Amino acid sequence: MINKSDYICTAPFRYTEVHDKDQWLCCPSWLPVDIEQGLGIKGNFRSEKAEEVRETILDGSYSKCDELQCPYLAELKNNKISARFITKTDKNIKLLRSEPGPHTVNFAFDRSCNYACPTCRLDFIMYKGEDRKLVEKKLKEVNEELAPFVKRLYLSGSADPFFSNSFRKFMIDLPVDKYKKLENMHLHTNGSLWTKELWDRMKSIHKFANSCELSIDAATKHTYENETRIGGNWETILERLEFITQIPTIKRYCFSFVTQDTNFEEMEDYYKLVKAYFDKRKTPTKWEVKFNRVINWGTYDKESFIKKEVFNKQHPQFNEFIEELNKVKELPNVVHNFHDLYEVKNTLI
């Protein structure tokens, strides 16, 4: 097992996730410390509270991080290390402390989406009026204050970027002249609106949009339309994937799968579904399937969420989940955050 104290996770030094009312230095479920101080995006990033979080990385404790949720810390137990980690040296510490601002900004300040996925929201959401004005205000702040040193944009950790009016317009009319250091635009989407016609209108981002994450969470029509992607159409997403997985400028794909009681039996089939698309791809690319634990973002009461946590050893279907996990955990291109279960069920895994 790799010792985390020998390495520095660079995310809290180079990444910020901006929500409409809060701000983070990593995925909120992986590093649950809100750094919003009313200082603006850049000011919050350099605030005393943000620096306190970074010190827990530098001292090797990672005490603010949730090691069960973070797939990158979880992978260390499997002797796998992500590129986000660098060796802890005086030179690297000095380098990280001198960063003028975030390299990566995650646009999570618009929750508009054409789906009402139960793990994410209780109903369909479309930002209008004052809500959209706030989105436009934050976009302006990013364009004017952060653009000069931003290398990566992430759209979006909270909405579907192709559905959000503000994000869609941003991608169509990207102010390239402001983002002189931009190298990558990562698209996180349910994929349903990512059509060739719309993509052709977004030519300004094509050279930057070289990675994406598609969240589908199902391998069957019933589960997709009735359990994990309310508002979705199975035939539509399969058709969209035929196009999306063949885009030559996309060099890295991630297919995420929020694992829960309603879909864990489809883990292996999900992997096969994804692999089949890349078996047909004309040009080589990198792809992965990421199995994550379901997280309660406030959409479940305590009793309901206990039923969702099939990976909890007290869950009546825990052993069945372990059997399904065994089928995929060693497959090529699979990433997951269930490594702690090896110690719980070592005889089965």
Predicted regions and their residues:
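Short cysteine/histidine-rich metal-coordination sites, predominantly Zn2+-binding motifs
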Residues: S82-L95, K133-K138
